[in-house]
From Swiss-Prot:
Pfam families: HGTP_anticodon (PF03129), tRNA-synt_His (PF13393). It comes from Bartonella quintana (strain Toulouse) (Rochalimaea quintana). It catalyses: tRNA(His) + L-histidine + ATP = L-histidyl-tRNA(His) + AMP + diphosphate + H(+). It comes from the Bacteria. The keyword Isomerase does not apply. This is Histidine--tRNA ligase. The keyword Protein biosynthesis applies. Its EC number is 6.1.1.21. Keywords: Aminoacyl-tRNA synthetase, ATP-binding, Cytoplasm, Ligase, Nucleotide-binding, Protein biosynthesis. GO terms for biological process: histidyl-tRNA aminoacylation. One of its GO terms (molecular function) is ATP binding. Homodimer. Belongs to the class-II aminoacyl-tRNA synthetase family. Signal peptide: none annotated.
Length: 498
C-alpha cells in the first residue's frame, strides 16, 4: 500500500449539474414572475418532502417499462421503501388525501421543487431538474382546465415570451381512449401495448408521421443502429391512430368536426370533443383563442391523465447537437387526472394541473437573449494592506460601516499582496475598493479607487507614466467620510448606465 494518501477525484455525478450565482439569480427571478401569476389566479403555496413512500408515488413514470425502475429508492429503518419524487403531482395527491377533511374544495395550490429521474442522462436530459406546478383539486368542470391553460399562457408572457413565440397545445385523453378502444386496446392485459402506443404518438414532433407509423408497427431503427420495438399494430389499426394525429385543421371548429368523425358514436370520445368545445368557447371569450389551440397529437406520457391534456410549446428555432435547426419544443404540460387521489380514498376526486420545467425555460430564454441578468454590482472590497491585529480590526470596522448603510461589502481575507487583491476585486466585479495603509491609518485617511471609472479611463490614457502620476479614479477622504464617498461613487456609476 502506498504511503502517499490517494486523492479523491473531484467529479460531478452524471445527470446532475452545479448552478452558478448567475444561474441562481435567473432562476429566482423567473420563479418570482411565475409565482406572481399563480397567486393572481388565487393559488397558494405548498411544499412536500422530496422523499415519499414508494407505493405512494405509484407506477406512473413515463418512458419506463419496469415499475419504479426510473426512481431513486432506499429502505428506511422499518424496511419500508422510500423514493425521491419523480414529479410534484403524486405528492400533491397524497397530501390532499391525507388532509381531505380540512382543505377547501376546490383546492388551489402551487408547488416548486426538484424532481428526480433515475434515467440514462444525455444532452439536455438530467436526473435532477426543477418544476413549478399549479393544480386545482376537487372540481370536475373543464372551466378549471381552461383556467389552467390561460394561466400557463399568462406565465409565459410574464417571462417575456411574445404571442408568436409559443402555443398551448390542447387535446383530450377521452378522444384517444375512444380510438384505442376502437382498435381493441382495452383491459389490463393490453396495458403495456397501450403504453407503447402512447409513447409512439408522443414522438410525433421528434420523428414525424412516418417515424410514428414505424413505432406503432414492428419498430424503428434509428441512425445509430439502435432498434426500438414497436406496438405491433396491424396496418388498419395504425391508420386509425394516424387519422387522429392528422385531425388538426385550419380552425378550431374544423378540428372539432374532424375529431367527431374520428370517434364516431363512441360516447366517451364524443364527451371529450364536447369538453374541448367548451374550453374553446372560454378561450375565445377571453382573447386566448390564438394562444391555445386544439392539437390531436398531444397525449402526454403519464398514464394517470383522464381528460383534457395540454402542452406549452415554444415555436422558435434553435440549433440541435448536429447543428440543424429544430423547433425548441415543450417546456411544460399537464392535464386532468381524476383518478390519482382515488388510490388513497377509494373514490374519484377530480383534479387538473400544469407543470413548468424551469431548467428548460432557462435554456429557452438564453436562446432568445432574455435570460434575467443581475445588474447590481459586486461588493465593495476593503483591501488587507496590513495584517496587524489593530489594522484588521480597523478594516473590519470599515466593512461594518458600509453594511450598516446598506452597501454590500467584504474584507479581503486571503493572504495575497496588493496586486492579487486588485485582481480579486475585479473578479468579484467590485464597483470600488477601499485602501488604507499604515500611513493613511496614522493620518486617519482612506483611499477609494473607482474600478468602473478606472477601467474607462485606462482606455483613454495610453502612457504608463501619466497613468501612475495622475492616479485616475482614485480619491483620498477622511475616515468619517467613507460611507458618503462610497455612496457618491455608486450613485455616479448608476447614473452612467442610463
Amino acid at each position: 500500500m502506498s504511503s502517499k494518501q490517494e486523492k479523491t477525484k473531484a467529479r460531478l455525478p452524471r445527470g446532475f449539474i452545479d448552478r452558478t450565482s448567475a444561474q441562481l439569480y435567473a432562476t429566482e427571478t423567473m420563479i418570482a414572475q411565475i409565482r406572481e401569476v399563480y397567486e393572481l389566479y388565487g393559488f397558494e403555496a405548498l411544499e412536500t418532502p422530496i422523499f415519499e413512500y414508494t407505493d405512494v408515488l405509484g407506477k406512473f413514470l413515463p418512458d419506463e417499462d419496469r415499475p419504479n425502475a426510473g426512481v431513486f429508492s432506499l429502505q428506511d429503518e422499518d424496511e419500508q421503501w422510500m423514493s425521491l419524487r419523480y414529479d410534484l403531482t403524486a405528492p400533491l395527491a397524497r397530501y390532499f388525501a391525507e388532509n381531505f377533511e380540512i382543505l377547501p374544495k376546490p383546492y388551489r395550490s402551487y408547488r416548486l421543487g426538484f424532481v428526480f429521474r433515475n434515467e440514462k442522462p444525455g444532452p439536455g436530459r438530467f436526473r435532477q431538474f426543477m418544476q413549478f406546478d399549479a393544480d386545482i383539486v376537487g372540481t370536475p368542470t373543464v372551466a378549471a382546465d381552461a383556467e389552467i391553460c390561460m394561466m400557463a399562457a399568462d406565465s409565459l408572457e410574464k417571462l417575456g415570451f411574445q404571442h408568436h413565440d409559443y402555443v398551448i397545445r390542447l387535446n383530450n385523453r377521452k378522444i384517444l381512449e375512444a380510438v384505442l378502444e376502437q382498435i381493441g386496446l382495452v383491459g389490463r392485459e393490453k396495458a403495456e401495448k397501450r403504453l407503447t402506443v402512447l409513447r409512439a404518438i408522443d414522438k410525433l414532433d421528434k420523428f414525424g408521421l412516418e417515424g410514428v407509423r414505424l413505432l406503432l408497427g414492428k419498430g424503428r431503427l434509428d441512425e445509430s443502429g439502435d432498434f426500438t420495438k414497436g406496438a405491433q399494430l396491424k396496418d388498419q389499426e395504425i391508420d386509425s391512430v394516424l387519422a387522429l394525429l392528422t385531425g388538426e385543421a385550419e380552425t378550431a371548429e374544423e378540428t372539432l368536426d374532424a375529431l367527431r368523425h374520428v370517434v364516431g358514436h363512441h360516447i366517451q370520445g364524443l364527451e371529450g370533443v364536447r369538453e374541448l368545445e367548451e374550453m374553446q368557447a372560454i378561450f375565445a371569450a377571453n382573447g386566448y383563442q390564438n394562444r391555445i389551440k386544439i392539437d390531436p397529437s398531444v397525449v402526454r406520457g403519464l398514464e394517470y391523465y383522464t381528460g383534457p391534456v395540454f402542452e406549452a410549446t415554444l415555436l422558435f428555432d434553435v440549433l440541435n447537437d448536429d447543428g440543424q435547426k429544430v423547433v425548441f419544443g415543450s417546456i411544460g404540460g399537464g392535464g386532468r387526472y381524476d383518478g390519482l387521489v382515488a388510490r388513497f380514498r377509494g373514490e374519484n376526486v377530480p383534479a387538473t394541473g400544469f407543470s413548468i420545467g424551469i431548467s428548460r425555460l432557462i435554456t429557452a430564454l438564453q436562446n432568445l437573449s432574455k435570460l434575467p441578468v443581475k445588474k447590481t454590482p459586486g461588493p465593495v472590497v476593503v483591501l488587507m494592506m496590513d495584517r496587524e491585529p489593530e489594522a484588521v480590526a480597523q478594516y473590519q470596522k470599515m466593512v461594518m460601516q458600509l453594511r450598516k448603510a446598506g452597501i454590500r461589502a467584504e474584507l479581503y481575507l486571503g493572504a495575497s499582496g496588493i496586486k492579487a487583491q486588485m485582481k480579486y476585486a475585479d473578479r468579484r466585479q467590485a464597483p470600488c475598493v477601499v485602501i488604507q495603509g499604515s500611513q493613511e491609518r496614522q493620518d486617519r485617511k482612506i483611499q477609494i479607487k473607482d474600478l468602473i471609472e478606472g477601467t474607462r479611463l485606462s482606455r483613454e490614457i495610453k502612457d504608463n507614466q501619466t497613468w501612475r502620476e495622475s492616479r485616475p479614479a482614485q480619491i483620498t477622504v477622511d475616515e468619517e467620510r467613507l460611507v458618503q464617498a462610497v455612496q457618491d461613487i455608486l450613485i455616479s456609476q448608476n447614473a452612467q448606465k442610463f
